[in-house]
């Protein structure tokens, strides 16, 4: 079992570096970053990867609220200086702060997410850029170094709660003087600078019948609020009493720079596996779809990164006809092409299979593709994500392809695929 410098276990490292003698651990669920088609462009390494599997710890690692008090010099208070004491400091003024101490909770496991590569962070998340991310660089990240923490009940794994902010290497969380905070009765709470937003789907994520819910903000203490006027506004939203911070299968978590999808262990049992998706590719290729111009057989590749191959399929985004690479009907000025099957003029893009199973809401043939990126998936999966608004900028929203984070185009954001072998 791999231990960190702060004494906690790393589930990712334990999973990859186990000696094979440990019993399989209970899987709580997965956190999957939107915008990656199964892995990071540079490859998944350690805690930096496209998805993070939450396993039950050998020993409980959770903490719960214990007591709070006011101090005059927060930086020199005992709780802050004690590296073994989890605490949150709410700065009220230069000379006054409320310290909330936390104690061990034997009923929960804690997992932390953020941009920092320090040991308390279980899942290192960097800013997601749309499209091809091979050479992309972010000049200034908007993701917090210690963005959020998730506490899972060890006896009731379906109860996974999310909280804004995570504990640093000294087991402290600091909310500065300018941070949004408030005190109700005896409890104090606050929001992080750019906030942690959550969106629970309405209905079951598996099955494809769920609808997009409303985005909410989660506080440091775990309460749920309506969104602020802008991402970092000082005034908090209204409390939402009929919603909670328990993650549901399909809950989205936005960290202002990256959006994560929570898939519960139960939900994943009803989702396709990578092997299932590869079999779907084989089934399409077995039909030997042809290009109507070159008359060559098209082959959907399994690999995500593909070059201009003679058998590579392309889709006309205005009509959905799938063909090979050719120069017929190309407009030299705009680059648009006229489809030889229906004479519709429009853009053409390479067709690529969506290979991240967690994004699928059902199991079936990949008969639709996102516009404009060309990632293929099932009809219900494509239509679900085309109706999900992802936070963008300070107060905007936009629908994106979950496999590459490219903003969707067109009236619907998707197109039904028409293969030559299915034509009469």
From Swiss-Prot:
Subunit structure: Interacts with pll.
Modified residues (Phosphoserine): 10
Region called Disordered, residue ranges: 1-21
GO molecular function: kinase regulator activity; ubiquitin protein ligase activity; ubiquitin-protein transferase activity
Phosphoprotein among keywords: yes
Transmembrane segments: none
This protein's UniProt keywords: Phosphoprotein
Family affiliation: Belongs to the pellino family.
Biological processes, Gene Ontology terms: innate immune response; negative regulation of antifungal innate immune response; negative regulation of defense response to bacterium; negative regulation of Toll signaling pathway; positive regulation of antimicrobial peptide production; positive regulation of Toll signaling pathway; protein K48-linked ubiquitination; protein polyubiquitination
GO (cellular component) term, any one: cytoplasmic side of plasma membrane
Lineage: Eukaryota, Metazoa, Ecdysozoa, Arthropoda, Hexapoda
UniProt keyword Phosphoprotein, yes or no: yes
InterPro entries: Pellino_fam, Pellino_FHA, Pellino_RING
Functional description taken from the UniProt entry: Scaffold protein involved in the Toll signaling pathway via its interaction with pelle/pll kinase.
Name the UniProt record assigns to this protein: Protein pellino
Pfam families in alphabetical order: Pellino_FHA, Pellino_RING
């Amino acid at each position: 079992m791999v231990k960190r410098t702060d004494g906690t276990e790393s589930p990712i490292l334990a999973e990859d570096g186990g000696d094979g003698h440990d019993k399989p651990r209970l899987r709580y669920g997965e956190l999957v970053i939107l915008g990656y088609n199964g892995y990071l462009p540079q490859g998944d390494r350690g805690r930096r990867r496209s998805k993070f599997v939450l396993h039950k710890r050998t020993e409980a690692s959770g903490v719960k609220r214990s007591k709070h008090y006011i101090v005059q010099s927060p930086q020199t208070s005992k709780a802050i200086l004690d590296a073994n004491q989890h605490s949150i400091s709410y700065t009220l003024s230069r000379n006054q702060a409320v310290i909330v101490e936390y104690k061990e909770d034997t009923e929960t496991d804690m997992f932390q997410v953020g941009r920092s590569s320090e040991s308390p962070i279980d899942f290192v998340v960097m800013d997601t850029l749309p499209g091809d991310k091979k050479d992309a660089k972010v000049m200034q990240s908007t993701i917090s170094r210690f963005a959020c923490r998730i506490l899972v009940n060890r006896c009731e794994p379906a109860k996974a709660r999310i909280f804004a902010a995570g504990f640093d290497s000294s087991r402290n969380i600091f909310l500065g003087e300018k941070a949004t905070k408030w005190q109700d009765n005896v409890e104090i709470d606050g929001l992080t600078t750019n906030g942690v937003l959550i969106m629970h789907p309405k209905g079951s994520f598996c099955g494809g019948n769920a609808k997009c819910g409303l985005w909410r903000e989660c506080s440091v203490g775990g309460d749920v609020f309506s969104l602020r006027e802008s991402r970092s506004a000082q005034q908090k939203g209204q409390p939402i009493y009929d919603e909670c911070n328990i993650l549901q299968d399909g809950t989205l978590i936005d960290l202002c720079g990256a959006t994560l999808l929570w898939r519960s262990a139960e939900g994943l049992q009803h989702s396709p596996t990578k092997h299932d998706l590869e079999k779907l590719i084989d089934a399409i290729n077995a039909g030997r779809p042809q290009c109507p111009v070159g008359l060559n057989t098209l082959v959907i590749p399994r690999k995500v990164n593909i070059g201009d191959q003679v058998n590579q399929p392309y889709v006309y985004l205005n009509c959905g006809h799938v063909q090979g690479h050719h120069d017929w009907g190309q407009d030299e000025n705009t680059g648009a092409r006229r489809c030889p099957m229906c004479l519709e003029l429009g853009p053409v893009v390479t067709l690529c299979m969506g290979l991240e199973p967690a994004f699928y809401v059902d199991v079936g043939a990949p008969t639709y593709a996102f516009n404009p990126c060309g990632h293929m998936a099932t009809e219900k999966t494509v239509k679900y994500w085309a109706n999900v608004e992802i936070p963008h900028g300070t107060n905007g929203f936009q629908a994106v392809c979950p496999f590459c984070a490219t903003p969707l185009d067109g009236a619907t954001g998707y197109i039904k695929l028409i293969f030559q072998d299915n034509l009469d």
